[in-house]
């Protein structure tokens, strides 16, 4: 990890910018700093692709009954939960290592949910 990445991550941690559901335990913060931006990005991509596969498996196994799959409904749900957690952890780490402001994320989230509500006439 480059000096700028380290300084940025340390500054972000000192600012206490990660509250709420995006709080990382100290050991997670340290591990993320050791891995650096590139490895954190790669790990996030991998975990998100595994989440996509788990969502697809859940859809076929649970929602589209009768589709041949290698998992039982309980296994599909358990796998989906595990992949959700893996992706959430990586997203938290990515937010930290890139120094993304949580308030900005909340603002974007509000804009997107408001837009969806308008489109649905809610």
Predicted regions: what is each one?
Residues 2-122:
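Flexible "arm" and connector segments at domain edges
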């Amino acid at each position: 990890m480059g000096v700028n990445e380290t300084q940025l991550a340390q500054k972000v941690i000192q600012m206490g910018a990660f509250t709420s559901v995006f709080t990382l335990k100290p050991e997670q913060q340290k591990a993320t700093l050791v891995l650096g931006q590139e490895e954190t990005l790669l790990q996030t991509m991998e975990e998100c692709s595994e989440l996509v596969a788990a969502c697809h498996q859940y859809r076929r196994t649970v929602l589209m009954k009768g589709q041949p799959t290698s998992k039982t409904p309980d296994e599909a749900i358990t796998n989906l939960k595990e992949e959700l957690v893996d992706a959430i952890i990586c997203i938290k780490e990515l937010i930290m290592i890139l120094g993304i402001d949580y308030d900005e994320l909340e603002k974007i989230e509000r804009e997107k949910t408001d837009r969806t509500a308008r489109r649905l006439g809610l």
